[in-house]
Amino acid sequence: MTERLEAEGSRRGNNSKWDDKSDHDDVTKIYVNYSLSGIESIRFDYVKSGKPKDGPFRGQSYNTYTHTFEINHLKYEHLESVEGYYTEDTGIEALQFKTNLRISEPIGYHHDGCTKFILAVEGKKIIGFHGSSFALRVGSLGAYFTWDTPTIIKAVGGKVGTKWDDGVNQAGFTKIHVRSGQKGIQFIKLEYVDKDGNLTDGPIHGSIYRRGSPHVFEFKHDEEYLVSVEGYYEGDEECEVIQGLQFRTNIKTSELMGSNTGKKFKLTASGMKIVGFHGYAEKNLSSLGAYLTPLTPKKSECKGITDGSNVWNWDDGAFEGIRKVSVFFTALRIRCLMINYEDAGKVVKRSHGLNNNDHQEEKFVVDYPNEFITSVVGTMSSSSVMPLIFKTSKGRTSKQFGDYSFDDSVEFVLESKGCAIVGFHGWHNPVSGYMTALGAYYYPMPLPPAAEKLEAQGGAGGAPWDDGSNFQGVRKIYIGTGEVGIVSIKFLYENDVHEIVVGDHHGNKNLLRHEEFDLDYPSEYLTSVEGSYDVVPGSEEYEVIIMLKFTTNKRTSPCYGLDDDPIFVLHKEGHKIVGFHGKSSNMLHKLGIHVLPISNS
């Protein structure tokens, strides 16, 4: 439902009223013509039913400055609010626009005699404007708001059973309960915190009246959110059943709940988080779909002095990333902060403070998009912020900018787990120019890529197994050998929270002795596996693995098993091995790998 906020501004009698109406999907571009006297004309472009719609200029202008502000609705950006200043005599003097991702520069000029106004409705976006104009002035401005509807990914799988929909009232998930059985996922149940902050148990979707394997995935809703679901489904058309599910947050990945048989699917979208689920269920979970909303930057509080008549506020808003930070400082003060931001392929420069020739300049260049600033360490006193140190996602640390601390100085850190700093805001003294306070905007860093599964090599016999891909690397390999070659294998992994994970034995579990290949983890990692396979006594007509040899970034292992020339290589250029899968009985029939890109850090 559309909500109209009345126009704010001058009520002069000869105002000419105008109305762009509310039948639009989004605002896409704003043009503002302004002078020292105020905002003289304004124009809004929209998108309607997926097609662009250019609006007319409202007001008249002559010999003005022009500012444009583009909103990328294709990247789920939308206009949330407008802040402005006006007087009764001159109308709108200054404007600033805020989207769910960033803030425009202040447009125009205002003074102490102006009245401030804000056009905003919590949880809604602007889809149209109305207002009035007179004599080379925009007199007033109002807006139309509507709910920002989530993106829907349709349910994947069958349509057997009852259609269910948990909606989008969740502020964050806390637990996901899944039970798997021989015929697939039996049920799914979600626990979450609603938008009022209440812990809520969602209903069970599926059946609880059979035996199965329970799985629970728990996470902290205040810092963790769901970014994707991978799964498998199989069955006749319209009667498919979900066979396995795996959930991924911005911090960690769940185990595979169920099996990886059938067709693979993925519920995800770049730059978005999952806020709800829907699907079909009866005796089993037939299908699963999701609701998603855009991830939004989080604004920190300012550290330092933020009140008093001698300090002014500044706010850059949030961008895609930071390319360079220049700090101008003397022995006692940081006088100016200059930041080069990344904005859709363009560099946007912002400067705050007093930039003259009586100070030292130091620069810190970031290798964007491969590197992000993740934290700022500084000290604050009763009069200023000084010194500053910047740290990045690659583990780099800048030099210390400034070296003097006052007796009352207190250290502070601007940092949010799993996030990059994508913007700054703060306060400075307009006379001396020195910084008095600093804050940041945080945005989730791009997720590390999901591991790629390379096809297993070997014979056709045995039962399938998969250690999974939720690891950072391989620490140790146990190889069981016999007269016929490789009869068993086991791997020791390390996960993303530095826990050691012991994989299952694959092959003959009764061997008393194994050969071992130790890696100097984390500096050493697996890059390839060579092997061969053949029919041997006891394997019937099936081929089994008879030789394996492992190569790391530092060395090559001995040849395990029979002395045979390799007939296959498991390898992908620029990648490391982080997991294994294959087939086995009382012998090893087949071996495959999961790989991740090698990080330069």
UniProtKB/Swiss-Prot annotation:
Keywords: Lectin, Repeat. SUPFAM superfamilies: Mannose-binding lectins. GO terms for molecular function: carbohydrate binding. Residues 2-147, 150-294, 297-444, 451-597 form the Jacalin-type lectin domain. Residues 1-21 are annotated as: Disordered. It comes from the Eukaryota. InterPro entries: Jacalin-like_lectin_dom, Jacalin-like_lectin_dom_plant, Jacalin-like_lectin_dom_sf. PROSITE patterns: JACALIN_LECTIN (PS51752). PANTHER family: JACALIN-RELATED LECTIN 11-RELATED, JACALIN-RELATED LECTIN 3. Belongs to the jacalin lectin family. This is Jacalin-related lectin 48. The lineage of its organism: Eukaryota, Viridiplantae, Streptophyta, Embryophyta, Tracheophyta.
